[in-house]
């Protein structure tokens, strides 16, 4: 049995209180995170930088949102471990409709658990929880600024 590093809200509290200096943008970002508190804080931080946010608490909800969303999606920030459809399954399905979409995985689980989902921090963008607002915003900007088709 694997348990996440932490599911408590203190990991996200630093997101709200920290001053962010990263450059924002106008891109559309879908955030898929089952912890409502963490989801709200991530979208609050990214929204304050001008990004357009779509948010989902499950893989199934993410698929429904994308089915009704009429524009493009530039980035998906997805928790690796979600109830029902996990983050990698969501991404695999979304890439069929949005092939140029960029991906940033987030997780509170250790590397050996994440690797069971086919995720490697040397091959994909991965941000380990807890993370600061600066770490989040800098990583989001880094991923968005990569050239199309870039693979780690």
Q: What is each of the regions a protein language model found here?
A:
Residues 33:
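Conserved acidic carboxylate
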Residues 58-61, 83-90:
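Acidic catalytic/metal-coordinating carboxylates
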Residues 39, 60-67, 92, 137:
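Alpha2 helix of the CheY-like receiver
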Residues 40-48:
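Charged docking surfaces used in two-component/phosphorelay signaling
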Residues 50-61, 65-66, 127:
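Short hydrophobic/Thr-rich beta-strand motif most characteristic of the beta2 strand and flanking loop
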Residues 1-30, 117:
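Disordered, acidic interdomain junction associated with two-component signaling
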Residues 79:
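Active-site residues of response regulator receiver
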Residues 14, 88-89, 93-129, 133-142:
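Alpha4 helix (beta4-alpha4-beta5 surface) of REC/receiver domains from two-component response regulators
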């Amino acid at each position: 049995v694997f348990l996440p590093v932490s599911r408590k809200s203190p990991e996200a509290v630093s997101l709200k209180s920290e001053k962010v200096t990263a450059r924002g943008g106008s891109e559309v970002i879908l955030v898929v995170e089952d912890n409502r508190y963490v989801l709200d804080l991530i979208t609050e931080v990214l929204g304050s930088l001008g990004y357009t946010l779509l948010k989902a608490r499950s893989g199934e909800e993410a698929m429904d949102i994308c089915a009704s969303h009429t524009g493009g999606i530039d980035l998906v920030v997805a928790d690796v471990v979600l109830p029902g459809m996990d983050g990698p399954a969501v991404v695999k399905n979304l890439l069929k409709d949005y092939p140029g979409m960029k991906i940033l995985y987030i997780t509170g689980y250790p590397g050996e658990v994440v690797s069971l989902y086919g995720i490697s921090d040397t091959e994909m963008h991965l941000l380990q929880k807890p993370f600061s607002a600066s770490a989040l915003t800098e990583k989001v900007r880094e991923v968005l600024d990569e050239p199309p088709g870039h693979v780690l």
